[in-house]
């Protein structure tokens, strides 16, 4: 079951997000959804469907290895019924953030990313002129048994 996106704790989180421009939500994904995403990612990896990451939309998409060296797999909701519970939950998250912060968040896109040892993602601007619609980025770490000393955001 997805967390409730209402109440005092949610309101405090949205206040922090509005003030600091980021929010950390531990244990965000319900365990059953997390397991489904793990299984899906394992199949993507086993089938060698991860591609070198790039920045920019459509024809402007460019691989710049000095900015990021990870590998990604874009999620396409109509083609991935096994991830429907994930997408339904993210619909609820999008709606709750939009309502709390008075934003017009109409859509989203997701990808899975793998960072092999030594891989990186440097801060950059990739809000290209052809698309000026990004308002919020959501990063969900799927690392099992992750500890703060392992590093990362």
Language model: regions and residue ranges:
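Fe(II)/2-oxoglutarate oxygenase catalytic core
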Residues: 1-137, 141-153
């Amino acid at each position: 079951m997805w967390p409730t996106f209402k109440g005092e704790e949610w309101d405090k989180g949205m206040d922090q997000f509005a003030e600091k421009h980021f929010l950390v939500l531990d244990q965000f994904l319900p365990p059953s959804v997390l397991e489904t995403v793990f299984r899906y990612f394992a199949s993507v990896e086993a089938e060698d469907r991860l591609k070198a990451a790039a920045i920019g939309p459509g024809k402007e998409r460019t691989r710049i290895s000095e900015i990021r060296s990870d590998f990604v797999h874009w999620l396409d909701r109509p083609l991935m019924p096994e991830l429907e519970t994930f997408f339904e939950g993210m619909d609820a998250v999008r709606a709750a953030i939009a309502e709390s912060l008075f934003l017009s968040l109409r859509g989203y896109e997701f990808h899975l990313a793998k960072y092999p040892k030594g891989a990186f993602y440097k801060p950059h601007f990739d809000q290209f002129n052809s698309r000026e619609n990004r308002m919020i980025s959501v990063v969900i770490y799927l690392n099992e048994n992750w500890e703060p000393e392992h590093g990362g955001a």
